[in-house]
Amino acid sequence: MMRSHYCGQLNESLDGQEITLCGWVHRRRDHGGVIFLDIRDREGLAQVVFDPDRAETFAKADRVRSEYVVKITGKVRLRPAGAVNPNMASGAIEVLGYELDVLNEAETPPFPLNEYTDVGEETRLRYRFIDLRRPEMAEKLKLRSRITSSIRRYLDDNGFLDVETPILTRATPEGARDYLVPSRTHAGSFFALPQSPQLFKQLLMVAGFDRYYQIAKCFRDEDLRADRQPEFTQIDIETSFLDEKDIMDITETMVRNLFKEVLGVEFGELPHMPLAEAMRRFGSDKPDLRIPLELVDVEDQLKDVEFKVFAGPANDPKCRVTALRVPGGASMPRKQIDDYTKFVGIYGAKGLAYIKVNERAAGVDGLQSPIVKNIPLDNINVILDRVGAVDGDIVFFGADKAKIVSEALGALRIKLGHDLNLLTCEWAPLWVVDFPMFEENDDGSLTAMHHPFTSPKCTPEDLEANPAAALSRAYDMVLNGTELGGGSIRIHDKAMQQTVFRVLGISEDEQQEKFGFLLDALKYGAPPHGGLAFGLDRLVMLMTGASSIREVIAFPKTQSAACVMTQAPGVVDAKSLRELHIRLREQAKAE
């Protein structure tokens, strides 16, 4: 091997030993005839000193520049008193350089690596191979590796088998657009890249592999956000002969073990919260329990008021009127309230009513708001009591369709929590349970809330008679307002699976065309089974404190689903298109 140690491994115990380092020149300094090189590798930094006594080596050190690749042999020694660098893991020692070999020179990088600089993300992605040299980026990928190793160890120790499933498969309706791959040997036909290994892992259960896992690549052609990529990694788990409680216990223990092993963080037992409660109290199916603010329904106090903005929704069963108390918010300036009004508008809210509670004992005179003159004081007092308002608070109101109010005030709750530094703890995990089987589209049709293979809590007859009332055997693990993973008990009975397909409007012909292989499998002794999948990228993002999953993926795509480094996607030559039986239509020319 060319090196004897990594830079980050050097410490006082190696004092007096000869070692060899390989890495990049992170920083070069010349002080009073002595040259200092900070050498960097994936494990950290080490300071190497060259003095003029070794003239040939000193001359080489004088010629090297930042990002040269070097091999250095020297002796470890303790730094002089007062020269210890507490910001470096190896800051108590340095290496007196004897030999220096330049393994490769380097041009000046497009951005500096040895200090924080405000470099645009596109530039960083264009030169990702340089961006990843930065210690903070290397630390994220190293932590990602520790996370996957911990998960694999836990699952292996608990009897799970790591089984690969196909990447080239066929399109199935899973909620997002598929990435399609044309077949050269089957003209006019296409493979689809998997959005998840869902059906294959269920088939593995039918085959008798009762504990399966896979660190799986998945693909979705969807609009991108901070927590989305066209290709992403999933910790995929499936089991047979276990119920919801068993699966949740196994995966919860896995996550608790992971956080303790990797971050030294210990969780207690995760609370369980029904979806209806999460939406009612927090306006979200993935509530952030670190924020001590809650939505409180107040329709009953506003049904008969003259203020139609409140009275209309208060009397409509499809609407919601909700209050959100912010402690100490009465001092909030009007501009800040206006900014929050614009913010909730993003979610469809038409406005943001409020009451500033200056002095409750003074009655209406102690309340500051354009709306108090339209609501009887007795009703206002009931509302203020219900939300727990005291002098110095502000209470915001939302009144509209239930979905709009929940989304708008739920998002406002999160924003207020961060803007006003209200977070009460660093980590707040929970399980969200009791999801509906279906959700209604604007046209009145139904779609599966999770996917069409989720088992309901009722019989096929009850499901078909009243599908909107059916609850599923699904569960999501949520951490700090982010969905870490979701899963369910699956349907293992053919009649139940066909009932779900019928409720979703999938004809028998379409069932056979798209899911015939699954329906066939369910005829041959499918066991009760269920599972869960965690988003690895999201998990690493949370554990590293990164602002985007792009920060924890080695070579991510941009928000327009492109790779600026390789220039993918790219144009394909005419010969390749002919072999794939594809002809491109000419784009209309802009006038």
UniProtKB/Swiss-Prot annotation:
GO terms for molecular function: aspartate-tRNA ligase activity; aspartate-tRNA(Asn) ligase activity; ATP binding; nucleic acid binding. It comes from the Bacteria. One of its GO terms (cellular component) is cytoplasm. It catalyses: tRNA(Asx) + L-aspartate + ATP = L-aspartyl-tRNA(Asx) + AMP + diphosphate. Residues 198-201 are annotated as: Aspartate. ATP binds at residues 220-222, 229, 483, 535-538. Its main location: cytoplasm. Keywords: Aminoacyl-tRNA synthetase, ATP-binding, Cytoplasm, Ligase, Nucleotide-binding, Protein biosynthesis. Its EC number is 6.1.1.23. Gene3D superfamilies: Bira Bifunctional Protein, Domain 2, GAD-like domain, Nucleic acid-binding proteins. The record marks 31, 82 as: Important for tRNA non-discrimination. It is found in: Cytoplasm. One of its GO terms (biological process) is aspartyl-tRNA aminoacylation. InterPro entries: Aa-tRNA-synt_II, aa-tRNA-synth_II, aa-tRNA-synth_II/BPL/LPL, Asp-tRNA-ligase_1, Asp-tRNA-ligase_1_N, Asp/Asn-tRNA-synth_IIb, AspRS_core, GAD-like_sf. Homodimer. Aspartyl-tRNA synthetase with relaxed tRNA specificity since it is able to aspartylate not only its cognate tRNA(Asp) but also tRNA(Asn). Reaction proceeds in two steps: L-aspartate is first activated by ATP to form Asp-AMP and then transferred to the acceptor end of tRNA(Asp/Asn). HAMAP family: Asp_tRNA_synth_type1. This is Aspartate--tRNA(Asp/Asn) ligase. The lineage of its organism: Bacteria, Pseudomonadati, Pseudomonadota, Gammaproteobacteria, Pseudomonadales.
